[in-house]
């Protein structure tokens, strides 16, 4: 059974943090070749701190997907200008929002655990909406790649592109807003239930 849960940075066990940061290195450095900082075969940065909360998706106690949330009132990758060279002036609005970053689904583990038929992206996206709603946020902002945008669109989550930029690889990247309303939540639930019916 796939389980999804959130953990604050301060409560993250050592073994789980090592697993997370190792998987992030595999995804963002080894597979995607992003400009990220790596040390001891792990990827982490200054935003992995007490203001961060992580969503984990696990199967048989193995992490298969994850992302990091940071309230936009605290330093985060978008507001701090990490992506300024890729965009022409981006700024998050004032309000009670949360930024999502370092989102990944581990393809190798999905294959090894024979989960390729499971609606993992929809489950992860639903957990994002549920977390944001439970915490009283107005919505979620993130910067994503073009392939990730396609995954969002296929899931049924009606995200909106706030601004388009160009990465160091000359690929389109997007500042997106993710609404957390009932309609989007229900579409994701329907997609998950549709898969469950097929599997059943």
Swiss-Prot record:
Keywords: Autoinducer synthesis, Quorum sensing, S-adenosyl-L-methionine, Transferase. SUPFAM superfamilies: Acyl-CoA N-acyltransferases (Nat) (SSF55729). It catalyses: a fatty acyl-[ACP] + S-adenosyl-L-methionine = an N-acyl-L-homoserine lactone + S-methyl-5'-thioadenosine + holo-[ACP] + H(+). The keyword Cell inner membrane does not apply. Its EC number is 2.3.1.184. It is an enzyme of class 2 (transferase). The keyword Iron-sulfur does not apply. Transmembrane segments: none annotated. GO terms for biological process: quorum sensing; signal transduction. One of its GO terms (molecular function) is N-acyl homoserine lactone synthase activity. Belongs to the autoinducer synthase family. PANTHER family: ACYL-HOMOSERINE-LACTONE SYNTHASE, ISOVALERYL-HOMOSERINE LACTONE SYNTHASE. Required for the synthesis of BHL (N-butanoyl-L-homoserine lactone). This is Acyl-homoserine-lactone synthase. The lineage of its organism: Bacteria, Pseudomonadati, Pseudomonadota, Gammaproteobacteria, Enterobacterales. The gene is swrI.
């Amino acid at each position: 059974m796939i389980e999804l849960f959130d953990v604050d940075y301060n409560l993250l066990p050592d073994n789980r943090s090592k697993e997370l940061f190792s998987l992030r290195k595999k995804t963002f450095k080894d597979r995607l070749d992003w400009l990220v900082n790596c040390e001891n075969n792990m990827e982490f940065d200054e935003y992995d701190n007490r203001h961060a909360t992580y969503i984990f998706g696990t199967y048989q106690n193995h992490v298969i997907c994850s992302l990091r949330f940071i309230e936009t009132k605290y330093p985060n990758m978008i507001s701090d200008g990490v992506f300024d060279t890729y965009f022409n002036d981006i700024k998050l609005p004032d309000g009670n929002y949360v930024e999502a970053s370092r989102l990944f689904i581990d393809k190798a583990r999905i294959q090894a655990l024979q989960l390729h038929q499971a609606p993992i992206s929809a489950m992860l996206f639903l957990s994002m909406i549920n977390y944001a709603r439970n915490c009283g946020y107005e919505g979620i902002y993130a910067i994503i790649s073009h392939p990730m945008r396609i995954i969002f669109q296929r899931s049924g989550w009606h995200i909106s592109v706030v601004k388009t930029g160009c990465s160091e690889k000359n690929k389109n990247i997007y500042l997106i807003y993710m609404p957390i309303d009932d309609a989007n939540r229900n579409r994701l639930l329907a997609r998950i239930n549709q898969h469950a019916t097929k599997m059943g």
